[in-house]
A protein has these predicted regions:
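Acyl activation and transfer enzymes in specialized metabolism, enriched
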Residues: 38-62, 178-197
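Short, charge-patterned binding micro-sites
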Residues: 76-90
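Gly/Ser/Thr-rich phosphate-binding loops and adjoining beta-strand/alpha-helix segments
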Residues: 3, 21-49, 66-80, 95, ...
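Helical lid/core segments from catalytic subdomains that handle acyl or acyl-like groups
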Residues: 88-146
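Active-site-proximal acidic secondary-structure segment that organizes catalysis
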Residues: 158-213
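Domain-scale detector for complete catalytic domains at protein termini or as standalone homologs
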Residues: 1-11, 25-26, 34, 55, ...
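Flexible, Gly/Pro-enriched loop and linker segments at secondary-structure and domain junctions
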Residues: 1-31, 126, 132-175
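Solvent-exposed residues in well-ordered beta-strands and their adjoining turns
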Residues: 33-37, 87, 167, 183-185
Length: 214
């Protein structure tokens, strides 16, 4: 794990970070309907495919890897890994599992499946223990679709990493759409960066999981 400290005095975002981190602490969220038609047509498992795609784009851009590490240093990680929730039907609780990222989907899927076998039934907040500091949170609410979603974190204004929440997919105009809520910190991520992320995520979904009819 590599963490590169940021020199705030020479950082191009110094003024913006100071404003949205210290003067007017600000996080924001938005929901985007992603076209997952081809992914569903292929019969791929939705959760690991989305975890892979999201993490791939997170690892492309520094603004989604910028954080304050346990030592209190501002900087960015070279690579991130997803930490995601799994639901326990028997007692209606959930646990968090983290999976090591791999650039190739089949390799990531193998890591995911191994973690599910080992930790999928483990109870408690952390089903898989000892998550590394270079993880980011992902969750899914598969029982409901939504067009708005927001996390209210009372002490979360020093949390700089993105938070992703997926909802229930639905049909519209012949397409299968998946709502994805993304919460980011304005000190490191502007609207431009968020929209670029979504555009690249949508493109990757079509590229990595092309329609079998093509």
């Amino acid at each position: 794990m590599t963490f590169t400290p940021i020199d705030r005095e020479t950082w191009e975002r110094k003024e913006y970070f100071d404003h949205y981190f210290s003067q007017v602490p600000c996080t924001y969220s938005a929901v985007f309907p992603l076209d997952i038609t081809s992914l569903r047509q292929r019969g791929e498992k939705l959760y690991p495919a989305m975890l892979y795609a999201i993490t791939t784009i997170v690892n492309r851009h520094r603004e989604f890897r910028t954080a304050i590490n346990p030592k209190g240093q501002l900087g960015f990680y070279q690579q991130m890994h997803p930490c995601y929730t799994v639901f326990h039907k028997d007692d209606e609780t959930f646990s968090n599992i983290w999976t090591t990222y791999a650039p190739e989907y089949r390799d990531f899927l193998a890591n995911y499946q191994l973690d599910q076998q080992r930790y999928g039934s483990c109870k408690g907040m952390m089903g898989k223990p000892e998550p590394p500091e270079n993880t980011f949170p992902v969750s899914m609410i598969p029982w409901a679709s939504f067009s708005g979603f927001n996390l209210n974190l009372q002490k979360g204004y020093d949390y700089l990493l993105p938070i992703f929440t997926m909802g229930k997919f639905y049909q519209e105009n012949g397409k299968t759409l998946l709502p994805l809520a993304i919460q980011v910190h304005h000190g490191v991520c502007d609207g431009f960066h968020l929209c670029r992320f979504v555009e690249e995520l949508q493109a990757l979904l079509k590229e990595a999981f092309p329609s079998p009819q093509q």
